[in-house]
Amino acid sequence: DVFIDGVQLYEAPCRDQVFAPVRRTRVRDSWTGTTVPVEDPDVTELVWFAEVGAGAPTIWANFGRRAPASSLVEVSVRPTVFWPSEHHIDWITVRGFEMAHAATQWAPPTAHQQGLVGPNWAKGWIIEDNEIHHSKCVGVCLGKEGSSGDNYATLRRDKPGYQYQLESVFAARHIGWDKERIGSHVVRRNHIHDCGQAGVVGHLGCAFSRIEDNRIHNIALRREFWGHEIAGVKLHAPIDVTIARNVITDCSLGIWLDWETQGTRITRNVLAANCRDLFVEVSHGPYTVDHNVLASRASVEIASCGGAFVRNLIGGTGRLDPSMDRATPYHVPHSTQVAGFGFIPGGDDRWVGNLFFGGDADEAYAPDGWFGGRAHHGLEGYAPYPASWEQYMEGVGESATDHERYFGRKLPVYARSNVDLEGARPFDGEEGSAEIPGECALSVSVRAGGVDGPAGPDAALRLVVLRVALPGDFSGFRLPLPQVTDLERAYYADAEFEA
């Protein structure tokens, strides 16, 4: 990247655009199909382009009206800022730094993942009270090393990335991916912003970690990259990971948990002003989402089974996306040992004591986009799902062979004691839920700045102002406070909810 006085230029697609830059005020979000404002349109006219050949690279830059001779101009080339070159450099604390302007590489789960700062392949790091910003791709990386796979799908083109990702799980086990040697990191009270791919990323190496009290914003807003690895927090195999009390706003996607989301807890986070808030993909649980504010237009996307959503405030849509073309692993509880594989027929979700706001789903997803017409406010998207284990077993008994009985059969949904405000619609199988008509409103604002490290827990949450207007009839309704023992076991892992 190229910077002038700390301002990051845009990378131009060709040299001609350096001399005739195009000012942009809006950009299309490819996942939702919506167009969103560009944060600072004036900066879109500050651009650079590089030609790289056998000799020295040549860089052209347009600094607009800024004078480079009297300014601080930086070309970032370092792949990381704080990163061990060897594995198993354990128990390191990184505290109190400002770290910025790293030329980090794209970090998919099938590659050697690197970030501006991270432990490489190790255990027990604490990354706290730092400001981490303007990384080309990733801010904090808790991810995979290279011997278990390094972009083989791209280099060899013989098998899909999905297959290589499966292989990487077993390859990592052979080199010591377990609780005793890898993971258990803490990422807390950091101010992470303006990264091109993810604020925090990690495959395998993130297991057993805590990500808490961080302020994360302005992630992937330039839409320089397209891929399945982009979010404020993007984790694969977040086994027994806790994501707590973070404030995540102004990202293309807030939190994305992908593969092997098991024993994971997402609790007391505030997500707002994102194109999408929370996406849980091809996982089998058990995972818990509780006491969060999910206030963006697209609040929840579920392409998984085994979730428990408890006492959340959900201001936008929910979207369901079963996946019968990818079987992914689940594990022995609290372990990296693989217990089995399963597809994602949908269902096996629990929704207890949530508050749903209504709205226009076309504002969350463009009608002509990939997911237009497939999102709902409330739980009505579960309409074709059985509402109990008994209903599910009745359907199983009607078929002759195993394939007919089970393949693609939707799993039961357990929904109770939720509240649907004006415009939100319930699942027919809900128990003890309420629809409350009348005007309502929800807004979230966040004060500028980072987090105050010495303030301790909740430092990020203290930046938030939440305003809610509820109908008068709501005052008579009380949301339950269920215990984890009240939640039905996860189907595939056959495991209890413990978090």
Q: For each predicted feature, which ranges?
A:
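Extended amphipathic secondary-structure runs
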Residues: 179-219, 224, 347-365, 404-435, ...
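Solenoid scaffold repeats with emphasis on beta-solenoid/beta-helix
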Residues: 87, 91-92, 97, 110, ...
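Short glycine/acidic-rich loop motifs that flank beta-strands on beta-rich extracellular proteins
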Residues: 79-81, 103-109, 114-115, 136-142, ...
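Hydrophobic, small-residue-rich alpha-helical packing segments that form membrane-like cores
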Residues: 135-232, 236-242
